[in-house]
C-alpha cells in the first residue's frame, strides 16, 4: 500500500473545502441528495441507512441525519443499494481494441469508474507518442483513468523487435503527471532478481509511487528477491498456493479474469475477511464482445458472490476500496464524507444489477456518452498512421523442412491460460505423430525485413484455415497460425493491407477481417459495432476447429517471452523457463 502520493490526487481548493464543510454541517444546500438508499458498509459489513449528500465532486455526508437536508436536486434510488465505483487494478485498454474514449463509453455505465492502465501495448508500437495520447485521453475522461508508466519496452531486451523505445529519461518526464500512479508491471523479473542496474534504476526512480509486478509461477528465493527489490503486487498468479505465498510475503494479489487468462476460479478461494484489503480485481485484457455480453469488473464481482460465496461487503471491497488504498487513491473506494462521489446504485447487489452510476458527483447518462464519443475522440488527437512496414508475403515464406525420424519442439496451448507447455513431436513421412499440430509464424512488422520466425503449435484446435493478427504481445508483430502455407500468406497479406488488424481465412478465402487503424491495435468504431465485428470473427474462427474461447487473445500471447514455457518471437523459439532461445529441432 502506498500512501505517499495521496496529495497528488485529492485536488480541492480552500473555497471548495469551505463549501463542502458548510453542507456537511447542514449550513448550506447540497447539489444532490440520494434518497431511499441503503449503503453497503465495506468496513464493518451490513448496511447503512439514510441519504447520501453530494457537493461538487465530493460526498458531504451519509446517514439518517441528512433526511431533511436541502438539495438543488434529489435522486430517488428506489430502494437501491449504493456501493463505491468499481476499480480495475490492472489492464491494457488497447487489448479491448477500443480507444480509451470508446472504452469509457462501454464500461462507465457498468459501474467501472476507475481504471489503472498500463499502455505498454501502444508504447511498444510508437513509443512516447502512444503514452502521450493515453495521457490526453485520461485528462479529458469522466472515468478516472490513471496510468502506470510502462517499464519494459520491449518486454524483454534482445528477444524481439518492437516499434519504439521508451527510455528512463522519457519515463521520468511523465512521473509527475497528475494521472500517473506508478511504474507498470516489471516483466523482466530475472533481471530484477539478478540486480541489473538498468532495471533497479527504474525501480528507484518510481519507488515513492506504486511498483507493479509480473511473476507467473515464481516462488522460493527468487520470489523473495523480487519482492525485496520493492515490487508490490502481481496479477499473473494462476495457482492457489502461489497466490497464498505471495500474500504471505507481503505482496498484494490482483485476481485476474480476462478474456484469455482466467484465474478467478483458482484464486477466489483465497479471499477472506483478513486478507481482502490485500486482494484486488483486474481484467488485464478483455474484449468488447465479453464486455457487452458478460460485463467487466461487475462480472467478476457477480461470480465471486454467486459461485464462490464471498460475502457482499468483501466482494465489493476487493473491487474498490482495496485497490484505491493500494495505489494511494484515498479519495476513492468508500462512500464516506470527504470521498469523491463515485457511486454505483444497484437494484440487486447480489446480481450486480446496475441501476445508475455517478462519477465525480455527476450522474452518468449512457446515451450522452455515446453521442459525444466521436467529438471527444477527435479532441484527443489519436496517433493515426500506418505502422505496418512489411511487404506482402508468399507461401514460400512459411516453408519448413522436416526430416523423418527427427523430433521437433511444439508450443502446447492450454485453453484459457497464458502459459504454455513445451512438448515435442516426431516427424515421419506421414506427418507428425500427433494430429493437432499446426504451423505458427511471427513476422517483424517494423521495417527490418527479417524472415518469418516459424514454429509448431499444438492443442490450439485449428483443423483448417488460418488466423492472423497484428495484436501479439508485447511487441505486436504479425502472428499467424495455419494448416497451410498458402492460407497463412493470405491471412497475413490481409492484415498488412488493412494497416493492422485480425483475419480469418478458410477454404482459400478471407472469411472475416477487422481493421485496427490505430497502431494495428485499436479500432475507431463504436463499442457496439466492434462487438458485432468480433462476433463475426469468432463465428468464422469456430468454423476452423474447436479453438479457445477467445482465439485471437490466446494467440496474441504466444509471442510473449516473459510468460512460460515456450513462445515464438520474431527472433525465434524462446524458452520462457530458461530465458533463452532454443531450436525447433530437439537435438539433446
UniProtKB/Swiss-Prot annotation:
One of its GO terms (biological process) is adenine catabolic process. Disulfide bonds: none annotated. Its cofactor is Mn(2+). It holds the Pfam family Amidohydro_1. Keywords: Hydrolase, Manganese. Induction: Repressed by H-NS. Activated by insertion of a variety of IS elements into a region extending from -145 to +13 relative to the transcription start site. IS elements essentially eliminate the H-NS-mediated silencing, but also stimulate ade expression 2-3 fold independently of the H-NS protein. One of its GO terms (molecular function) is adenine deaminase activity. Optimum temperature is 60 degrees Celsius. The keyword Transmembrane helix does not apply. SUPFAM superfamilies: Composite domain of metallo-dependent hydrolases (SSF51338), Metallo-dependent hydrolases (SSF51556). It catalyses: adenine + H2O + H(+) = hypoxanthine + NH4(+). The keyword Manganese applies. Its EC number is 3.5.4.2. Optimum pH is 6.5-7.0. Belongs to the metallo-dependent hydrolases superfamily. Adenine deaminase family. NCBIfam families: ade, PRK10027.1. Homodimer. Ade is a cryptic gene in wild-type strains. The physiological conditions that lead to its activation are unknown. This is Adenine deaminase. The gene is ade.
Amino acid at each position: 500500500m502506498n500512501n505517499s502520493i495521496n496529495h497528488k490526487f485529492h485536488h480541492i481548493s480552500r473555497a471548495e473545502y469551505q463549501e463542502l464543510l458548510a453542507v456537511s454541517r447542514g449550513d448550506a444546500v447540497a447539489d444532490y441528495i440520494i434518497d431511499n438508499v441503503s449503503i453497503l458498509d465495506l468496513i464493518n459489513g451490513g448496511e447503512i441507512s439514510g441519504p447520501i449528500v453530494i457537493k461538487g465532486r465530493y460526498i458531504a455526508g451519509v446517514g439518517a441525519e441528512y433526511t431533511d437536508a436541502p438539495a438543488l436536486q434529489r435522486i430517488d434510488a428506489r430502494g437501491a443499494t449504493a456501493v463505491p465505483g468499481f476499480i480495475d487494478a490492472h489492464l491494457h485498454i488497447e487489448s479491448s481494441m477500443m480507444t480509451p474514449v470508446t472504452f469509457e463509453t462501454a464500461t462507465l455505465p457498468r459501474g467501472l469508474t476507475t481504471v489503472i492502465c498500463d499502455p505498454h501495448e501502444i508504447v511498444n508500437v510508437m513509443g512516447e507518442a502512444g503514452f502521450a495520447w493515453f495521457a490526453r485521453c485520461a485528462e479529458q475522461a469522466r472515468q478516472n483513468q490513471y496510468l502506470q508508466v510502462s517499464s519494459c519496452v520491449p518486454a524483454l531486451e534482445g528477444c524481439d523487435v518492437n516499434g519504439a523505445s521508451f527510455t528512463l529519461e522519457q519515463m521520468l518526464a511523465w512521473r509527475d503527471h497528475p494521472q500517473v500512479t506508478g511504474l507498470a508491471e516489471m516483466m523482466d523479473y530475472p533481471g530484477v532478481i539478478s540486480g541489473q542496474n538498468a532495471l533497479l534504476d527504474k525501480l528507484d526512480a518510481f519507488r515513492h509511487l506504486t511498483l507493479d509486478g509480473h511473476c507467473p509461477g515464481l516462488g522460493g528465493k527468487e520470489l523473495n528477491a523480487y519482492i525485496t527489490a520493492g515490487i508490490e503486487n502481481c496479477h499473473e498468479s494462476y495457482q492457489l498456493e502461489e497466490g497464498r505465498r505471495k500474500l504471505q510475503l507481503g505482496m498484494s494479489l490482483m485476481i485476474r479474469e480476462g478474456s484469455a487468462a482466467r484465474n478467478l476460479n483458482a484464486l477466489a478461494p483465497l479471499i477472506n475477511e483478513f486478507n481482502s484489503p490485500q486482494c484486488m480485481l483486474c481484467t488485464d485484457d478483455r474484449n468488447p464482445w465479453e464486455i457487452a455480453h458478460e460485463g467487466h469488473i461487475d462480472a467478476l464481482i457477480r461470480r465471486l458472490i454467486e459461485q464462490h460465496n464471498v460475502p457482499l461487503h468483501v466482494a465489493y471491497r476487493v473491487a474498490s476500496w482495496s485497490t484505491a488504498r493500494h495505489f494511494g487513491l484515498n479519495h476513492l473506494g468508500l462512500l464516506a464524507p470527504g470521498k469523491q462521489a463515485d457511486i454505483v446504485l444497484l437494484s440487486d447487489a447480489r446480481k450486480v444489477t446496475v441501476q445508475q452510476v455517478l462519477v465525480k458527483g455527476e450522474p452518468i447518462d449512457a446515451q450522452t456518452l455515446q453521442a459525444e464519443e466521436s467529438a471527444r475522440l477527435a479532441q484527443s488527437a489519436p496517433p493515426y498512421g500506418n505502422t505496418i512496414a512489411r511487404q506482402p508475403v508468399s507461401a514460400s515464406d512459411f516453408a519448413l523442412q522436416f526430416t523423418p525420424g527427427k523430433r521437433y519442439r511444439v508450443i502446447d496451448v492450454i485453453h484459457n491460460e497464458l502459459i504454455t507447455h513445451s512438448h515435442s513431436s516426431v516427424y515421419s513421412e506421414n506427418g507428425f505423430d500427433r494430429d493437432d499440430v499446426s504451423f505458427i509464424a511471427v513476422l517483424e512488422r517494423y521495417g527490418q525485413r527479417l524472415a518469418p520466425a516459424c514454429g509448431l503449435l499444438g492443442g490450439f484446435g485449428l483443423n483448417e484455415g488460418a488466423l492472423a493478427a497484428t495484436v501479439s504481445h508485447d511487441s505486436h508483430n504479425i502472428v499467424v497460425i495455419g494448416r497451410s502455407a498458402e492460407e497463412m500468406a493470405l491471412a497475413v497479406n490481409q492484415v498488412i493491407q488493412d494497416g493492422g488488424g485480425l483475419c480469418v481465412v478458410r477454404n482459400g478465402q478471407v472469411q472475416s477481417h477487422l481493421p485496427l487503424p490505430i497502431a494495428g491495435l485499436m479500432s475507431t468504431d463504436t463499442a457496439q459495432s466492434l462487438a458485432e465485428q468480433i462476433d463475426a470473427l469468432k463465428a468464422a474462427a469456430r468454423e476452423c476447429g474447436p479453438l479457445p474461447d477467445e482465439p485471437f487473445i490466446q494467440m496474441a500471447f504466444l509471442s510473449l517471452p516473459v510468460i512460460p514455457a515456450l513462445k515464438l518471437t520474431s527472433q525465434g523459439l524462446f524458452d520462457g523457463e530458461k530465458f533463452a532461445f532454443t531450436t525447433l529441432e530437439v537435438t539433446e
